[in-house]
């Protein structure tokens, strides 16, 4: 009951018909993040794309300037010296066939998956498991690489993956409600900039169509897109 009252109060503070400048929107999101844990602040963007077409997929990685406040668990498929490099760099789980067996059995104890190029024949067999979870290593995203240490460091330092869903919407966490508003806004603008740079050549019309900010337990606040690109 208390949860419902809190949500109703938060929703009443938001004008759902209004497009808020990002500074106002962020202030509302932070003031409505009153759960007993440090809520994640999320940015949602509606893009003018049709992801059903291969040439209109939007996907990428960005290291947010102020981090995310979340520590990612990193899994690495590697052998020999590269496996040792991964362990030394702070990977949470490292392996080859043994790690593949764990994944096949449903034990996935990582949020980001990195692989050296020679491991992709093995990792490729796990595509039906890793793919739907957004965990499949991809050379375009820098997660199929010989620079294992660099990839792990990037993942652990606040790197965010963004990917358009079927409806052309991107959802991404940009930090915690405890962050200063200015830092959250800086992260949001950095994410929008990365998404703009990832605009597919096949996209027609307005690319950044709608934007909204929300916290884990709070209502969505519509944002004036132009205030995210200024």
UniProtKB/Swiss-Prot annotation:
A GO CC annotation given for this chain: cytosolic large ribosomal subunit
InterPro entries in the cross-refs: Ribosom_uL1_bac-type (IPR005878), Ribosomal_uL1 (IPR002143), Ribosomal_uL1-like (IPR023674), Ribosomal_uL1/biogenesis (IPR028364), Ribosomal_uL1_3-a/b-sand (IPR016095), Ribosomal_uL1_CS (IPR023673)
Signal peptide residues on this chain, from the entry's feature table: none
Pfam families xref list: Ribosomal_L1
Keywords annotated in UniProt: Repressor, Ribonucleoprotein, Ribosomal protein, RNA-binding, rRNA-binding, Translation regulation, tRNA-binding
Biological-process GO terms, alphabetical: regulation of translation; translation
Domain of life: Bacteria
The UniProt record lists the keyword Ribosomal protein: yes
TM region(s), chain numbering: none
Any GO molecular function: tRNA binding
Annotated function: Binds directly to 23S rRNA. The L1 stalk is quite mobile in the ribosome, and is involved in E site tRNA release.
Family listed: Belongs to the universal ribosomal protein uL1 family.
HAMAP family in UniProt: Ribosomal_uL1_B
Subunit structure comment from the entry: Part of the 50S ribosomal subunit.
The name this protein goes by in its record: Large ribosomal subunit protein uL1
Source lineage: Bacteria, Pseudomonadati, Pseudomonadota, Alphaproteobacteria, Acetobacterales
Gene name per UniProt: rplA
């Amino acid at each position: 009951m208390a949860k419902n009252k809190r949500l109703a109060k938060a929703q009443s503070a938001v004008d759902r018909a209004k497009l808020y400048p990002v500074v106002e929107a962020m202030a509302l999101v932070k003031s409505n993040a009153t759960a007993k844990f440090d809520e994640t602040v999320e940015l949602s963007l509606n893009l003018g794309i049709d992801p059903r077409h291969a040439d209109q997929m939007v996907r990428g990685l960005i290291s947010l300037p102020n981090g995310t406040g979340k520590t990612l668990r990193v899994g690495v498929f590697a052998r020999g010296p590269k496996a040792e490099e991964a362990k030394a760099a702070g990977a949470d789980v490292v392996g080859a066939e043994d790690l593949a067996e764990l994944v096949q059995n449903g034990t996935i104890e990582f949020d980001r998956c990195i692989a050296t190029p020679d491991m992709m024949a093995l990792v490729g067999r796990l595509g039906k498991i890793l793919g739907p979870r957004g965990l499949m290593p991809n050379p375009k995203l820098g997660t199929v690489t010989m620079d294992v240490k660099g990839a792990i460091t990037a993942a652990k330092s606040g790197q965010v993956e963004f990917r358009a869903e079927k409806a052309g919407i991107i959802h991404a966490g940009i930090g915690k409600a405890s962050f200063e508003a200015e830092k959250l806004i800086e992260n949001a603008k950095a994410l929008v900039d990365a998404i703009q740079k990832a605009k597919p050549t096949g996209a027609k019309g307005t690319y950044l169509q709608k934007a909204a900010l929300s916290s884990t337990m709070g209502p969505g606040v519509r944002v004036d897109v132009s205030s995210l690109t200024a």
